[in-house]
Amino acid sequence: MTKLTKKQRAVVRQKFGGKCAYCGCELPERWHADHVVPVVRKLKAVKTGHHTYKLVSTGEMHYPENDKLENMYPACVDCNLYKHAASVECFRKMIVDGFRGAVNRSQSLRCAQRFGMLTVTPAADADVIFWFEKYQVEKESLNDQ
């Protein structure tokens, strides 16, 4: 299933009301169909210069069994590129750790924090809840009414 048909893309796009499965933004015209459970593409090193190489996809997958429509979620470009080949739980951790690390590494953010311009609340340590999780809860509560 390397390439989705237009009909399949339309189905994936509407899985969560036309929104990114992760951040919940309205999907723009250009969006990605993400493998929730990664397929992990195989890579090979290609020589580009005297001592330089770049990694390119071979077109093969380590987990081709995950390449199915049920495993595809709609994602905005930013979320999908950041998630890359991570699992949902790993992506959740990447977001929390990335935020904490950004504050710790940035002198301007630490300064803003000292001057009260930036407040890191306990919510920053809370679990990241993705749109698809909220959407499913909302959908279930509507069905219960």
Regions found by a protein language model. Name each.
Residues 1-7, 11, 15, 24-28, ...:
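Extended charged
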Residues 32-38, 74:
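Histidine-centered catalytic micro-motifs used for acid/base chemistry in nuclease
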Residues 39-45:
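Compact nucleic-acid interaction/catalytic patches
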